[in-house]
Swiss-Prot record:
Induction: Constitutively transcribed at low levels, repressed by argR.
Family statement drawn from the similarity comment of this UniProt entry: Belongs to the gas vesicle GvpA family.
Basic and acidic residues bias: start-end ranges: 113-127
Name of the protein in its database record: Gas vesicle protein A1
Organism: Streptomyces coelicolor (strain ATCC BAA-471 / A3(2) / M145)
Record GO cellular component, one term: vesicle membrane
Chief location bin: other
Cystine pairs: none
């Protein structure tokens, strides 16, 4: 009697850890999670987790496709507490400097108005022209 060994029918056969690791690195395994907890517009908690088991090329292709190369860049970046404090300080200083400049301009304007008013009242009261003062060098010459 002859014995025929049983042939394996089905899947690709046995594969070792090396084959599995090569497949994962080639295809890539990326677990990407972004969680943000806000209360009344104030960010309380921000969790950004990215677990990548892939080759560098695979990860860079994934990040470029998902536009996740730099998480904190772009127009959708929320300002953090240092940014908010800096903006408030800057806007407060800008408001104070605008107030100081407008106050200075108002003071100068008032001074010019007052000078005009004083000059106009002097012109009305004095009908004769003012005498011209001689220069000090001419006076010395005349005295000699």
């Amino acid at each position: 009697m002859t014995v025929v060994p049983a042939q394996q029918t089905g899947g690709g056969g046995s594969s070792g850890l090396y084959d599995v690791l090569e497949l994962v690195l080639d295809r890539g395994l990326v677990i990407d999670a972004f969680v943000r907890v806000s209360l009344v517009g104030i960010e309380i908690l921000k969790i950004d987790v990215r677990v990548v088991v892939a080759s560098v090329d695979t990860y860079l292709r994934f990040a470029e496709a998902c536009n996740r190369l730099d998480l904190e860049a772009g127009p959708r970046k929320d300002p953090g507490l240092p940014d908010l404090v800096g903006e408030m300080t800057e806007s407060g200083a800008r408001g104070k400097s605008k107030g100081a400049l407008s106050g200075a301009a108002e003071t100068i304007s008032d001074a010019f108005k007052q000078a005009r008013d004083d000059g106009g009242s002097e012109r009305e009261t004095s009908s004769r022209p003012r005498a011209r003062k001689a220069a000090p060098s001419r006076r010395k010459e005349e005295q000699e």
